[in-house]
Curated annotation (Swiss-Prot):
Residues in HEAT repeats: 1-37, 45-83, 168-206, 397-434, 436-474, 703-742, 846-885, 999-1037
Protein name: Cullin-associated NEDD8-dissociated protein 1
UniProt key word Iron: no
One GO process term, biological-process aspect: SCF complex assembly
Record function comment: Key assembly factor of SCF (SKP1-CUL1-F-box protein) E3 ubiquitin ligase complexes that promotes the exchange of the substrate-recognition F-box subunit in SCF complexes, thereby playing a key role in the cellular repertoire of SCF complexes. Acts as a F-box protein exchange factor.
SUPFAM superfamilies according to UniProt: ARM repeat (SSF48371)
InterPro entries (UniProt xref): ARM-like (IPR011989), ARM-type_fold (IPR016024), CAND1/CAND2 (IPR039852), HEAT (IPR000357), HEAT_type_2 (IPR021133), TATA-bd_TIP120 (IPR013932)
Gene3D superfamilies xref list: Leucine-rich Repeat Variant (1.25.10.10)
GO CC, alphabetical: nucleus; SCF ubiquitin ligase complex
Keywords, alphabetical: Repeat, Ubl conjugation pathway
Amino acid sequence: MHDINFNILKDRAMDVDPDIRFMALEDLRKFLQDESAASTRTTLNQSLENFFPILLNMLNDQNPDVQTQAIKSFEPMVKYLSNETFSKLVKKLFALVQQNSSSTGNVTGMKSFTVSVPNIALRSLFAQSNSRDKSEFVSDKLSNSNYRFDPHLARYIMDYLIPQIVGNPVTIDSIELLIDLVTEIGYVLTQDELLNLSLYLTKVALTETGLIGKKSMVALERVVALVRTEVVIDKLLAQINQSIEPTKLFVIFQLYSVCLKRGIKPNSIDTIYNTITSNLNIEATEEEDDDDLDFDNLVKENSLKDEALTTLIDLVSQHFLPVESKNTVIALIKSYVNYNPLAQDEDFIDDEEDDISFSDDEQEDDGDGENDGSWKLRAKATILTRALLKSFPDTLELLSKEVLPVFSFADSNDQVVSEVIKSSIAIVNSTSPRDSTNVSELFPIIAARMKLAKETQVPLFLKLVESLNRFDNTSLVLEVFKIIKDRKLITSGSFDYLQFYSSTLKFHDNLPPLVIERMSSDFIKNLDDKSFNMITDSIKCLSLLFHQDSLEKLDAIVDLLIYKVENSKQYPSDLVRQSIIALGEAYGRADKQKILNVFKHSIEYEGTSKTTIDVLTQIYSTDIPSEYSYLILKKLSTSIMSSTEATSVASLLLMNKIFERLPSGDYDDTAGNLVQLLAVTNKANYECIFHILIKLVGTVLQETHRAPLLQTIVKLVNEGKIEVADNSFFQFITTACNQIPDLYNFFEDGLNLNSELSAKILAICASQNKLENKIMERREEFQNYYNSNINDSRLAFDILFLGYVGTHIEVKELDVQTLIGLLSNSQLTNDDNISAASTALGLIAQKHIDSAVPIILNAYESSEKTIIRGSLVDSLSIAADACNEDQKRVIWDKVFNFPVEFDHEVITELKKSGELLGKIPVVDELTINTDNLKTTYLILVITKSLLNNLQATKVNNTLLDSLIKSSIEWLNIVNIDIRQIVVGNLLTGLHSKPDTILPILDSIILPKIFDQLQAEDSFKKIITMGPYKYVLDEGLEIRKLCYEFIYSVISLENAVIKKYNINLEKIASKIIEVGLIDTQTDITVLACINLTNYIELHKDSAVELITRDGGNAFTTMINNLKKQLSKKLSAKASTQDSESHQERIKSIIKLSKKFASVVEAAESIELAAAIRVWNEYNNDLKTNFTIYYNSTDGV
């Protein structure tokens, strides 16, 4: 938009024609909302200030549209005004507000209860910003006028307005303005100022009535929300407690609730609790006869009790209720859940007696005949039940036995019934299916009530029945359906009933015919509903319905589903896909040919192809005609080449299933596409592809496809994409050998002969085709190297080749004793040859397991060299796959109990031993208490293996819990290797077995991790190099692992962090205190990375952290970062040192840039000193490290 001429704007704004005045303001608003206006910001400030008098005058415009437009004109201009100009505008508007309040009061003699026009305009200036990102309105979040006030300006405004608001008579204008001020810029108020403001608002609430009193309570809620200390809450409550009078109790309870909901536990809980309970005594009321009741007094008493119960709910919900008061609260609940002092008899709430007609104003109680408000007390008592159960789960039994049976299910008030059902559901959901006695008493109550309940209440009772589906409630379900039938309720087309059906079907495998009949009829109607959502949700339920035994209307339902698929253009794609899934569920019981015909067509369309393939994979069996399979295969031959990975994989799975049942044949197109796919597909799909290729071996190895396939295989093998354990691949190689006699020669020429994989391939080829000459060549080579140079690099391949050949035929040159002798030869130093020999020994041992294992174990026990024992353990790991339980126990006993002195030299051996034992664990010996470091380390390695591989069962989880808790204590052992594996296991467990780690994370694990963050002298070694001495910090790797663990903790989802009460502020504090002063550059970088991650994921927590204790953590962080930046690079620094130095600076700058947003959000007077230091630090950072600062991304 072009610039605006303010001289013309003024003339138009003062025109006699209201339409012109309106358009002038509209043009101004559009101009201010245009981003290009920012380019004229310097001059715009003055122009807008000059326009103020006219705009202020227009607030009194006689035309309401112009007046409204004038009000709207203030908010967009805020971001273009200087602090000085904005302050002037606030003063002018506030003067108009005061003038309006004064004139209104003088004329009427009463306080106005409407907000003045100037006040609306003034408040619009603050509706900008700090709360906008939390607003429920999208327009707020996207607003171009979103603007954050400068803290100094916010402070000035508060200092100007708050004294005048507090120092003058209270009005609706002043209270409404105060609410907005506190909400938007209240962050600048100190705790003392918040206390004073709270005391003022408390006084207003206690002295004012009507709207002003209510609004003062709203303002107090906003103020208390900013309170961060117990001191303020306690002082505020002290004033409230001093004001307790019988006439003020109604407001007192509301004030209590405001303080309690802040979540900071006060010292005066007993006083609050006693005040509440002393006003909830109903004995006196019960003793009076109905004729003696003062109705007006009763209404007042009930209203006060309503507030008392509300406050008690808040107290209990915040977990502030003293434990010893639980039973008293339960007694109160029992007293009030059926409280009705005007009841004539026990059946006062029967619908038949509700014969009094009320006006609309009298209907609020919806059931209390005299409108005494007692229904609110019954509802609140019921809500209190849920709050108590949540805070004290151990009250479940009492609530189930004493409260649940007396709930007012038949209450004449709908709100009470709703709350009763919610609380009943809470009790039922907390009850174990093993303890169903108490909840089963609900069955007859529900059945009886559903016969008489209003039709609108029936869905509420169905929710309660749903919660009982976890128990054996088939009799109740049947009774409910009988009632529905007898009452002739319309249940089709209702999401409430559909949800009930879904839950019932989910928990009951064999429902009575009456139930299934009713459900089926409704499903048939729902499938023709006008709402696509109703149809889709109904179809999802059909998958459960089709598993029921009694289902007479199956064919009718299937026909409707078929219609949906055949006429797919009439319906949303998700609805059609759900129909296909449901047809798959019905396939086993319906007309199979009809369903197969539908799938034959739906597989052709892109929107339904993937779903159809998935369903066909589930239902495919031998009874599907071969002709149909051929048709589907033709489609799959194309879809396996889909650019969509999911479709390609699904097609492969179905194709594999079909080929398992089809006879051999000519599948040339399929074979060609599979060969192409093999070259480009994901590694995870190899197994399925080779399974299919085995079935197509006759076709795929014909001249057309042979060369591309074998070349692809060679490429995949040489690139390491095939694994030694890929059984389907080697099955294909074995099958292919029967088709191609010279396959050995092809692979020998193409494969990299330095890998175990190549050795295994060639061994299979040689064995399958009985190529004795090839085997003899390798035997002779082995003998030659064995006798001349056992460290020749070519020996490894020969050993592996003969080892794999030895799994098929006897190779006399390579028996168990020979391989053990080779491994024991002190001259064998080539690592590849050692590895090859241990692998071959394991392979040979598998074939002769009974004789080989004792020989290997004997060699293991007699060897004095750790490298030899480690190699023999590798062999046993391979052989163990063929061992029986007795043999595994022998291996365990020998290896686990082998005596060896624990030091760093045997770590590799112990790792191998632990990995072996992890495959064959003896649980009893894992849970022993030991001081032996070797045993400790072995258990830790075994634990790591179990964390990665153990299936989650109750027994296994108990074992892991025990192992983890034991290992945490081992962090006290001063040994680098042990500490490293303990922290590594905790990290592994956090990812693979979080249910084991998370419950003890904050209370047990993190304190131990924090202990490891400090560099320890016991892990430091002094190394002398010429005239210089260097300190080697061997504990560095432990600290690195700890920071990796902390990073994973910080990255947990917020729901997990909240569930397990993980204290993020404490974690961040430890990093600031310890990590940012670590002498090792790597740790400084990791500390910065962790803090940056913390800010990105948990900004609110970071704000909370730096505002605590007067900003101590904030100040510590600044000082520690300064210390890091003050470190200079040595003149003799190496290239690596220079790179580390640069990385440290960049990480600090990135953290500082990220931290700026936290500082901005936390700005307050209390942090003023720390923020000044921060600004100085930030300026120095930009000045001293300009190049790094400009090149480092802080977003």
